[in-house]
Structures are given as structure tokens and as C-alpha cells.
């Protein structure tokens, strides 16, 4: 598995990329492989204050539904509206099709997340 090294990862299979003062969040290639063809991405509440690990949204496939979690404490500031009409964008390119953006309460919280090698160990473990 070749993972982008310009971002962090969670044990629940989200990727997190810093862009200015917000974190862009999506699901990993491994997660979308496990889920299969996505049919719905949503239930993301822009403006919601979340703690790390709280449910930020949901992805549904023909096989299963899975929650997406906030990687850090923060406020959801954007949802990728393109995914409402085309959830399969994640299947096509999991590492470019972001789901939501979160403004962290403390940007240093990202230091608690996994780097690419750490995530690879979890995903393959």
C-alpha cells in the first residue's frame, strides 16, 4: 500500500491533511476498498462542535454503513457537496475526494495522529 506522506491518519481509517488553519478529512484507500461501491456520503453537520472520536458523518456502500469520525476536537466548517451527487468519487480517488473540513481547537492535536508508516502497520496488522 502506497500512502501519501503529506498527511496524518487515524486508526479508524480517516486521513487528515492540514490546509492553512483547517484540517481536510477523508477516508483511506483501505477503507473504501473494504466498503466497496459507495452510494451515500453525508450526515455531516457544518457548524457542529465535535470532540476527537465523535461521529462527524457517515459513508454507506452496497455492503455496509460506516461512521466517519472527527480526528481532533474542533468545528466542522465545510462538507464536500460534490459527494452528495457522486459518492463514488471516493472510490475513484480516496486520497483526493475529501469529505469534510474541521477547524481544530488545537492544531497540535494532529501530532497524536499516525504518520503513513504507523497507519500502514495498523491497516495491515
From Swiss-Prot:
Question: Which Gene3D superfamilies does the UniProt record give?
Answer: 2.40.50.100
Using the record's annotation, list all stretches that form the Lipoyl-binding domain: 22-103
Q: Carries keyword Membrane?
A: no
**Which keywords does the record carry?**
Lipoyl
Q: Name one GO cellular component term.
A: glycine cleavage complex
Its GO biological process annotations read: glycine decarboxylation via glycine cleavage system
N6-lipoyllysine, modified sites:
63
Provide the protein name: Glycine cleavage system H protein
Q: Which organism is it from?
A: Bordetella avium (strain 197N)
Q: What is the lineage of its organism?
A: Bacteria, Pseudomonadati, Pseudomonadota, Betaproteobacteria, Burkholderiales
Quote the gene name from the UniProt entry.
gcvH
Amino acid at each position: 500500500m502506497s500512502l501519501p506522506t503529506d498527511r496524518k491518519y487515524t486508526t479508524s481509517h480517516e486521513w487528515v491533511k492540514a490546509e492553512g488553519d483547517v484540517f481536510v478529512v477523508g477516508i483511506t484507500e483501505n477503507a473504501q476498498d473494504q466498503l466497496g461501491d459507495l452510494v451515500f456520503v453525508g450526515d455531516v453537520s457544518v457548524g457542529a462542535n465535535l470532540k476527537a472520536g465523535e461521529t462527524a458523518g457517515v459513508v454507506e456502500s452496497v455492503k455496509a454503513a460506516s461512521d466517519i469520525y472527527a480526528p481532533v476536537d474542533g468545528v466542522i466548517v465545510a462538507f464536500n457537496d460534490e459527494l452528495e451527487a457522486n459518492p463514488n468519487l471516493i472510490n475513484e480517488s480516496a486520497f483526493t475526494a475529501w469529505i469534510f473540513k474541521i477547524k481544530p481547537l488545537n492544531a497540535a492535536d494532529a501530532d497524536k495522529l499516525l504518520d503513513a508508516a504507523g497507519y500502514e502497520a495498523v491497516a495491515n496488522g
